[in-house]
């Protein structure tokens, strides 16, 4: 099922495509994703992690990559949607962790993404019962909430995930009052330096440990430099870093369960199917939903001679006009 390049044959019509979800080993998944993605891809992921590749079965080509993981703690639109903050009680915290998952990587290969609305297909696949069952089996979950955020921030009035009801629904804008995370060797070097000086300062089993480590180091640095010219310079740097982040559009899926909020918040553990929408979340129905949209897209591009034929892999040697 593997191929030399993670691409799709751009000459095939959407009506002829068939897909398979494949859970790849981490090393293989990382290699493929780094070929097509411009962002920094994390290899060490705390908490739950499901790495998937989507295979187009006729051409035996990979058309996209997905990584699902444990959700972030702070999410204002989620709190508003659920009618409360899950961290307020141990019961709600346990229920949330048992039922919720977040999409961190939803990246189509190119030109599949452009020619066939590949991003919408991958996002919809994340909302499928088949994905939910994979998570339930792997982590003994009772999955009923999938969430993700838009690629672009609030400077964009729309997102690639708009127009995806009932699979994905827009639920509001995230808060943007946070500092971009440090990754890779700079982060590890800084953490090691501080731990060598004062010992381990965030428990090994703490949730969102990397964020807590980063915020604690910033707080200690501010305290140590308080009242000094260096402290003023550091505070200004932090303020500038805060201005780099934008509010993101937050999207959620309930997998076709009408009482998902009560289950996520621990008020009950019995899921109730929405008779109008539940079946729409089966993978076969999701693919057919996508196929109609992709057919319109593909045939329009063909008619206007705008089909992209070039395989896009991230080498740094040429300019790509799609951030992913």
List PLM regions with ranges.
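Acyl-donor binding region in acyl/amide transferases
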Residues: 26, 30, 48-50, 56-200
